[in-house]
Regions:
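Class I S-adenosyl-L-methionine
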Residues: 32, 40-59, 66-67, 73-75, ...
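Conserved SAM-binding motif I beta-strand of class I
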Residues: 131-136
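Conserved class I S-adenosyl-L-methionine
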Residues: 100-110
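Serine residues within intrinsically disordered or low-complexity segments
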Residues: 7-8, 15
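Intrinsic-disorder-associated, low-complexity terminal segments enriched in Asp/Asn/His/Tyr and depleted
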Residues: 10, 18, 22-25
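Conserved alpha-helix/loop element of class I SAM-dependent methyltransferases that forms part
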Residues: 80-100
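Conserved SAM-binding loop of SAM-dependent methyltransferases across substrates and taxa
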Residues: 111-127
């Protein structure tokens, strides 16, 4: 292959991009391919798709077009789900190693992007009793997801038309599950997902909280009384009330989970920059972990900030 000079005046000793073999310079975006008169292939648009991923599934989820291409929005969605899968896959493998099969419940499933991708990448080739349950309040989404699972032969998937709160007592779900996920379950639905996970003795919980309005509403209601404490400056202004309430909600959730014996990891999702709700909370149950200190801190925070009326929402185990 013909080569150009190996250095440029501004970068001595460093190969310029065009100094590389032509085959290394051919990764162009579709628009540049068109300008260069090159054919635009489906592969040029789908290089992000994981090996073994069902193309039919990606088309059904409208991540790929009918001719197998991908636009910027669908590329972003796929990147988000794949990034989240990197966190969930080890939890799935640990549960499978421990119990031989995995039961996962996805709350606020929506169109079940996450559930379908998880099943396609992890579950479909394993011939065991593993199962994914998608919980969703919109009946039309439950129906369409059920039909898609049947069409793809994903027999280990079920979709239930329930609220997160109603699912706790539902007999359609097993008495115990391994993993609970809740992505952007609005406002208190995330707290209901936590209660569900605790009731079902889940080994792992994966949360991307959303719309934490309840705590902010209580802060706003009690603001006049709280202003005697200089700490109330943290939420005196309306914008700060909303932002502080959002962060405080997640802090209280983390303390609640720690009080129930979970080890917490809190991080930021990469590729979700378009959304301000990109905080990822992963909780793994650790038998024998200290529980008294996080429970004490949780109660003191509720009292100090004037949120005692939310004690039932952020319930902790009774201490001996």
């Amino acid at each position: 292959v013909a080569m150009r000079p190996l250095s440029t005046p501004d970068r001595p000793g460093r190969p310029a991009r065009d100094a590389r073999p032509d085959w290394l310079n051919c990764r162009l975006c579709p628009r540049r391919q068109a300008r260069a008169g090159l054919p635009i292939t489906a592969m040029s648009n789908t290089h992000e798709v994981r090996p073994g991923q069902s193309i039919e599934l990606l088309k059904a989820l409208h991540i790929l077009t009918r001719d197998g291409k991908m636009n910027q929005d669908s590329r972003r969605k796929l990147k988000q789900v794949y990034h989240l899968y990197q966190f969930i896959e080890p939890l799935l493998q640990n549960a499978r190693d421990a119990r031989g099969a995995v039961t996962l419940v996805d709350h606020g499933a929506g169109k079940s992007y996450l559930g379908f991708i998880l099943y396609d990448l992890f579950f479909k080739d394993r011939r065991d009793a593993s199962h994914i349950y998608g919980i969703e309040t919109r009946a039309e989404l439950v129906q369409s997801a059920t039909e898609l699972a049947a069409r793809l032969g994903f027999g280990g998937m079920s979709f239930l038309n329930l609220s997160v709160a109603d699912s706790i007592a539902s007999e359609q779900l097993p008495p115990r599950v391994d993993i609970v996920t809740a992505l952007h379950a609005c406002n208190t639905a995330t707290d209901d997902a936590i209660r569900f996970a605790l009731a079902k003795q889940a080994q792992s919980i994966v949360l991307v909280p959303c719309c934490q309005a309840e705590v902010a509403a209580v802060l706003r209601k009690n603001k006049a009384r709280a202003l005697a404490d200089p700490m109330a400056e943290l939420w005196r202004h309306p914008l700060h009330t909303r932002e502080f309430g959002s962060q405080l909600t997640n802090v209280l959730r983390c303390l609640q989970l720690e009080a129930h014996g979970y080890q917490l990891s809190v991080t930021e999702l990469v590729g979700w920059e378009h959304s301000m709700k990109n905080e990822l909370i992963i909780a793994r149950h650790q038998p024998g972990r200290p529980r008294r200190e996080p429970a004490r801190r949780l109660r003191e925070m509720l009292e100090r900030i004037g949120l005692q009326e939310l004690s039932e929402r952020f319930q902790v185990p009774a201490q001996p």
